[in-house]
Amino acid sequence: MSTDTVTEVVATGMPRIGDPAPDFTAVTTQGDINFPGDYEGSWVILFSHPADFTPVCTSEFMTFASMEDEFAELNTKLVGLSIDGLYSHIAWLRTIKEKITFRDMQNVEVKFPLIEDITMEIAQKYGMIMPGEDSTKAVRAVFVIDPKGMIRTIIYYPLSLGRNFDELKRVIVALQTADALSIATPADWRPGERVIVPPAGSCGTAQERVEGKEDGVTCEDWFFCTKEVTEEEVYAAIGK
């Protein structure tokens, strides 16, 4: 496939936040899947990596695998993808478990599915091929998909940069909290910190907030209001 063709696919087929997740069927290291239908009712992190048997990708898979239970507690499932074949995936994951130690992690078994995409069809559908980086490898893309199959977050990393997995977990918690409590989260928010109250929908409500008449709400000005939500309230709201 030429670079011009890949560029055209990316330009016309790039999914966006708020779009339904493009559907596909695939062969994976955990059997065949129908996506996103098989994951209805769960949050999903669908992520791509450039290639098997590469060091940055190895560190990422070990980290994701070590955090899989933490994501499961948030009703979130992990699905990986690269344009390598199934047998390459299997051999790489076996090598990770048997030979690789990274930080305090060793004997790491990757149990979540890793998609075979040797035709690049899925990677193209999700805009994971960036010709400016590499026309034959997927970049480090992350798609957060909600229980209704809608894309809620998209993050891209260049080939040389490993992902921040604590941030990905923070994104999941923040999205679930925003949905459950009808709020927004400020910069660098963590559970237990104050949250953003949606802007007032009327002049009257704005005035009441500024005057401190809305219980639990503190306003710096009419458009910038916060309220306290404890860490316990956050996790109760999202069902953890």
Identify the role of each PLM range.
Residues 1-240:
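Chalcogenol-based redox active-site neighborhoods
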